[in-house]
Amino acid sequence: MDETVYQIKAIIVLDNNGKRLCSCFYDPPGTPITPLTEKDKFEKLIFEKCKTSNCELEIIDNKVVIGSKQSDVWIFVVGNSLNSNELALLDVLNTLISLFKKACATDESIMITKKTFLENYALIRLYIDEIVSDGIIFEVDEETILNRVPIADNAAQSLNEAIEMAKEKAKGFGFGFL
């Protein structure tokens, strides 16, 4: 495994209680897939270690972790090893924060909150996928990413409205699980 290529082990977003809002774990080719129980344990370990500090830079479970608290949301970028390039991880974190703020912006605020994060989850996942793929950092230039993810606000709003309308129609047919 070439550690210079596979820099990222995970991107993790947690709420103020340490509950997962989003997590993307990356396992390089030829390595076993990390079991869900280990991912959960690692997320809890990160939160417990960082909840009393800003977690700008930590070594957790032999991995470099860089994180930031934004309102009621914690964002972490986890390096693949102790040899991970902290500056590359910081570039990824700063790009994530900037793009998340754009996605979560409202008329009143540009803060990333749990509510706005979840409302814009699909767009945020697209941003994450443009930045990192399979643990490889592909792009950290914000403008390039914004040009590649051409979802306008009204297009996303129309999609959300269509989903809500479909849920209402499904309820009319007795589908109570929606």
UniProtKB/Swiss-Prot annotation:
Coiled-coil region list: none
Query: Where, subcellularly, is it found?
Result: Cytoplasm; Golgi apparatus membrane; Cytoplasmic vesicle, COPI-coated vesicle membrane
Q: How does it sit in the membrane?
A: Peripheral membrane protein
Q: Which UniProt keywords apply?
A: Cytoplasm, Cytoplasmic vesicle, ER-Golgi transport, Golgi apparatus, Membrane, Protein transport, Transport
Q: Which InterPro entries match?
A: AP_mu_sigma_su (IPR022775), Coatomer_zeta (IPR039652), Longin-like_dom_sf (IPR011012)
An example of a Gene Ontology BP annotation on this entry? intracellular protein transport
Q: Which domain of life is it from?
A: Eukaryota
Q: Is Protein transport tagged as a keyword?
A: yes
Which family does the UniProt entry place this protein in?
Answer: Belongs to the adaptor complexes small subunit family.
Question: Subunit structure, briefly?
Answer: Oligomeric complex that consists of at least the alpha, beta, beta', gamma, delta, epsilon and zeta subunits.
Stated role: The coatomer is a cytosolic protein complex that binds to dilysine motifs and reversibly associates with Golgi non-clathrin-coated vesicles, which further mediate biosynthetic protein transport from the ER, via the Golgi up to the trans Golgi network. Coatomer complex is required for budding from Golgi membranes, and is essential for the retrograde Golgi-to-ER transport of dilysine-tagged proteins. The zeta subunit may be involved in regulating the coat assembly and, hence, the rate of biosynthetic protein transport due to its association-dissociation properties with the coatomer complex.
Name the chain's protein.
Probable coatomer subunit zeta-B
Which species does the entry assign this protein to?
Dictyostelium discoideum (Social amoeba)
Q: Which gene encodes it?
A: copZb
